[in-house]
A protein has these predicted regions:
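Iron-sulfur-cluster electron-transfer modules
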Residues: 1-185
Length: 185
């Protein structure tokens, strides 16, 4: 995650006496590697969170996928084919997707705050939607408790972070464009 290190501690970012920008240099290197076709299929598969997450919420399929992912044989296969270490923690697919099961917001008057517009657009993310919908439900409870109106963004794409880590900047751009359209109609 060299592209994120500049946010906390990387000393090799502008302004720098030698005009270094290490995080962006690393990002350019991964983009070049991706364009050359040197990224393995397993990494591409793992970065396709919207495709992989489609299994979440499908009765029986979720239980089968989660059970198989816990077997030693499957974990060894994932190691050899996808590069996922057999002992690495894997999030389970949720039995219900956040987007499918989240209640609509109660009708509330939007009251602008001192520093905020008084309403929230919820971009649920792949992880909340497919793996941990409880996080999203907790957020909705918090918003309801504080009488803050919300809307769950429809038709958003993955934020693109897994694709960014691969160097797949073209797909990141497509996701960004789709998400801007969904967030700012």
């Amino acid at each position: 995650l060299c592209d994120l290190c500049s946010m906390i501690k990387c000393p090799f970012v502008p302004p720098h006496p030698w005009n270094l920008d290490f995080p962006h240099t690393m990002m350019r290197a991964t983009a070049i590697t991706f364009r050359k076709g040197e990224v393995k299929g397993g990494a591409k598969f793992l970065a396709s969170t919207d495709v992989n997450g489609q299994f979440a919420g499908i009765p029986i399929v979720v239980q089968v996928v989660n059970a198989v992912n816990r077997t030693r044989t499957a974990r060894k296969l994932m190691d050899s084919q996808l590069g996922v270490h057999p002992d690495a923690w894997l999030p389970e697919l949720a039995s219900q997707r956040f987007r499918w099961s989240a209640p609509r917001a109660a009708s509330r008057v939007v009251t602008n705050g001192e520093r905020t517009p008084g309403k929230v657009a919820i971009f649920s993310t792949c992880y909340v939607n497919y793996n941990e919908p409880g996080i999203g439900f907790d957020l909705l409870k918090l918003l309801d408790h504080n009488a803050i109106p919300y809307v769950i963004v429809e038709k958003e794409k993955c934020c693109g972070m897994p694709k960014l880590e691969l160097g797949d900047l073209e797909t990141v751009e497509k996701h960004k464009t789709a998400n801007i359209a969904a967030l700012a109609p």
